[in-house]
Amino acid sequence: MALTPGAVGAAHATATTATTQAPPLRGSVATPLPAAPALPGPALRSTPALAMAASAATSPLDLAAVKQAVELIGKGRVDEATNIESTISDPLARKLVEWLVLRSDNSSADFSRYAAFIAANPSWPSIVTLRRRAEAALWQGRADPSTVLAFFNGDPPRTAKGRFALARALLSQGDSARAQEAVSDAWRGDAFSGDLEAQARTAFSGLIDTADDKARMDARLYAEDDDAGISAARHLDDTELAIARARVAVINRERNAKALLEAVPAAGQRDPGYIFSRAQWLRHSDKIAEAARWMQMAPHDPAALRDVDQWWVERRLLARKLLDLGDSKLAYAIASGAAAPNNENYRADQQFTAGWIALRFLHQPAVALPHFAHIADGASDPITLARAYYWQGRAAEAAGHERDARGYYETAARYPTAYYGQLARARLGLDEVTLRTPPEPRADLRGLELARVFDILYAIDARDVVVAMAGDIADKANDLAALVTLAEIARSHDDARATLRIGKKALGRGFPLELYAFPDFGIPNVEPIGPQVERHVIYAIVRQESEFNSRVVSGANAYGLMQVTAATDRDTAKRFNVAFDQRRLLNDVAYNVQIGSAELGNDISNWRGSYILDFVAYNAGPRRAKEWIEQYGDPRDPKVDPIDWIERIPLQETRYYVQRVIENMQVYRVRFDNSPKLWIESDLRRGS
């Protein structure tokens, strides 16, 4: 059933350089095959909430005022920005500054300002954030009960402060039952500071019972919020406090964790939270079989587990450790025995992991198939759906049901921008990646209120604000023409970040915005200082590493477009005889790309051309790449299945990263080569 394209030719190994300016959108992509099935998308609205009347063009004076307000807000001087707002004559520019003020962490606006903006602008970005701020203002400003009850009429609170404000209002009207319910919901489900906890204990002392404190203790410890967990435990008995202290020791990997676990009274050792931490400590201690035994003692009732998402994360780590030890049967039991997670991605991951173990390690396709089918439950994004149908195809194929397998592969192949959609196409012998063409931008929609907001922000070079708006808009808007208009504005300003943000979010919801989701601009032309790397590889990396943000600094202190660390910069600069200057990693985009692409090219050579190992090393370091070769075999070995090898990568982040970069490469080849040729199987085998 499989059909492998020929090996990548010599011409494919020649580097090209990128362009800085956004090229014309048309003509840069192959026309979709007539037989290619349409990707289902969300229902579209003909008259979107985005299409609101806009005022005339903003004057230079108003633009200067908006620019000054943005700068002041960035410095935390929000009240001064509010003063400037009152001097702006353009209503839309004034509204934009008000939105920026209300959205700021340093805003001192009262509830009435938040409520007025939310009521007048329900389709604006960040309304959920503004509503959360409004709830805080209700609590902190001790708003009168009628105001509080009116605000929450038909729209319940989202935050602890909102729930506490509602409870206070209900108590004032004698409704203690509903007040207790609001307090209990906050106590059991919300994260909040110690100061707010003290305020709430004083205000609602008669409404918080031991069950609330026990639930809070568990919830905060699953979230690894040590202080809040211990604080709640201090209102419980000695056994619960002992459990909490033992769990904190496990979370922090303290040397006395074992002693504290063993000191918990026998009755407390049946507590689900204790079982979780005991299994976690055993896994940390490489006592995997014993950890699995404890894990299997856990209850299956989600209510007893409290945090089914964290239980799944622990089970996933444990199941993979069991696979490493060769105990596939127990690994399957651990994975399949998990309570269904609440998080959509975790639910899909749990079903995939159980199905993958059943199919590829236990060789039981009939057991695997229903797991793979459940991956798609409630999913809408191409990556998840393609994975669901591809693996159903693999299970059906393994069971000898070729007709069913073909049907599953054909469904997966509807998602050609997704890794498993691309693999499904290769499995079917479809050697092309087809991208849908969005509708032409409509000039009449340039009058959209938010389109004009984009114009204002670009006029004052406030691109970070555009990016923040873009993601929220694309998450919620259902008007395709409006989304194309906003994406085209971003593209016309050479803003790869905002173009990507709109395209990527919208593509994940089924809209045909592939050409915006994979910008073919945003990386400057550079003279390579090391081995040349193809343009589609560099773009694939940048899209995943930084999403074209040249100023981003990661938690690991990686800098800029290609997320280069100072150590890499120093080593690469020395290797290729270039002056080392760490400051340039953020201040000089071309330098960042030179260093990053040189590192990438050097590593590709070191790994004999293997993209898989190069991308693993780029994300997780060469040491881990070598460790995983030792543990799982060499993906360059023809006897090793590269698809399974990638799925065996222990780090979730790196596993996801490699798949995303490989899928990005397939799309960027289409964009840059103007050819729909699919190379994914050759890419996975590169270096063999």
Enumerate the language-model features and the residues they cover.
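Structural motif corresponding to the intra-repeat A-B loop/turn of tetratricopeptide repeats
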Residues: K75, S104, S108, G141-R142, ...
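Residue at a conserved register position within TPR or TPR-like alpha-solenoid repeats
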Residues: L72, D105, L138, L170, ...
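Compositionally biased, proline/threonine/alanine/serine-rich low-complexity intrinsically disordered stretches
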Residues: A2-D62
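Catalytic glycan-binding domains that act on GlcNAc-containing polysaccharides
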Residues: W99-L100, A115-A120, K287-E290, P302-W311, ...
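Solenoid-like repeat scaffolds
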Residues: M52-T58, T82-L92, R103-N106, A115-P125, ...
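TPR repeat positional signature
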Residues: A65, A93-R94, E98-V101, Y114, ...
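Structural register within alpha-helical repeat arrays
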Residues: Q68, E98-V101, A134, L166, ...
